[in-house]
């Protein structure tokens, strides 16, 4: 005994929202102009004869009518927005005692939106001038009429004249009716096609293509009808009294002119816009098809009418003249818009769930041959995808079988015009088939590519770091080299080096050597002093080694001099010869030069000073170290 029971039923509710928005602003520009000119001349020429009869009358009437010039500019903007929203309808979960569960869900279609825009439109209508002329020349009343002309399409014109004459009065009335009618119609057709497909490369039965078709038809018709009516009446009375004398005859006359003008125009337009949308979805697994049709129809009707009337009156007389004009103008504008119902019918579709069954029974050894190959395709803007079943011969050590696996190939549109599936059988091992079942077949193909990408990334990082280090080393080497060159330039460009270079001795380098040798042992100092005895710049920076100037050599010519002159010589030589570059002129040479012996100058060489000459012992040099002065002080 099976008893069915419902576990739960939940109704989530249904929400259906339809929003319809219609906007149609219009702007019109009307320009009207009407000119009516009526000219009438009457000439009375009396003739001899019986006064009881009316004299001949010559009358000419020339009415001129200019029709209304209508300029109509209308801009219409139509915007339609239709949206619908649907939610989950119901959800039912039921089960029975036989361990069978059923779960079903039904959804309404998704939100849809339509937008329709009508472009602006302008209508220009103009009517050519129209004139009418009539001439009456008759004794009793003979009428001649000229039919007016109008340059317009679909135009009807009617004109009527009536005349009545009597011995004492003449009545002429005219009526003019003008009717204009023009129509304008426009039909537009919009068509949009789109196709989409949903497919899965792993399962060939889940290919569900859908087709959507959207077409829009817009029909617009306009009809413009204009009616103009002009009526005018002219009344003239001529009185002729009977007299038998030859006196002057007076003819009093009275005239009345009445004109009536009526103008009426109407404009009607009809706009019908409809949209038809078709959508179909095909599910090969369930062999079912669903078609939904949505229709939107929006007719619009509008009418414009205007009327104008003018009634002038003219009544001149013989004694006085007056002009009474009565005009009336009325304009009516009527606009009516009608919205039609919008119907949309989209039945819900239920997708059949796919079922997958895995059996643990051993694979049979029987072979199957797939002779028929079905090809399906899907395409986008640049690529075409072909789906077919490829035959594989799976071979293993214990079993061999033939199976068909779904295959997808992507081909560019510019490369191929037709495609045929290969009929050959591909041999593969059991691992290939196992990877296909697991869904990891594509991952194995991409392993080699991932390894190559990893090596490329590592190589790029190492190369970048090495290049940065090399650049840093090059910059550091250039900076150090530039700093050394600048320091060397400063040392060689000093003042002392310039003076030493003039005398043939580079003083800068030797001064450094002397300062270093002064810090060594006493034996090294003695060797340095002995080696540099001939170098006047050896003790350049040793200010203590400076001594008093060397003694004055004995005079060559011994002459008798008074004591005052001797004192002057000693004082002079002591003050002038205590520097290293003091003059070695002796008093005898100075005295001889003062006595006129210019050619008897001393032949001795310039003496450098005490402590630097070779003939001075080392002890004497040490005794005069405290009284020495430096070379830089001499320069200052």
Curated annotation (Swiss-Prot):
The modification Phosphoserine is found at residue 628. Belongs to the TDA7 family. Glycans are attached at residues 4, 257, 492, 557, 562, 626. It is found in: Vacuole membrane. The gene is TDA7. Its main location: membrane. It is a single-pass membrane protein. Residues 1-18, 510-541 have a biased composition (Polar residues). Residues 1-33, 87-109, 238-271, 299-326, 339-362, 510-551 are annotated as: Disordered. This is Topoisomerase I damage affected protein 7. It comes from the Eukaryota. Residues 19-33, 87-108 have a biased composition (Low complexity). Keywords: Glycoprotein, Isopeptide bond, Membrane, Phosphoprotein, Transmembrane, Transmembrane helix, Ubl conjugation, Vacuole. GO terms for cellular component: vacuolar membrane. There is a cross-link at residue 512 (Glycyl lysine isopeptide (Lys-Gly) (interchain with G-Cter in ubiquitin)). The chain crosses the membrane at residues 457-477.
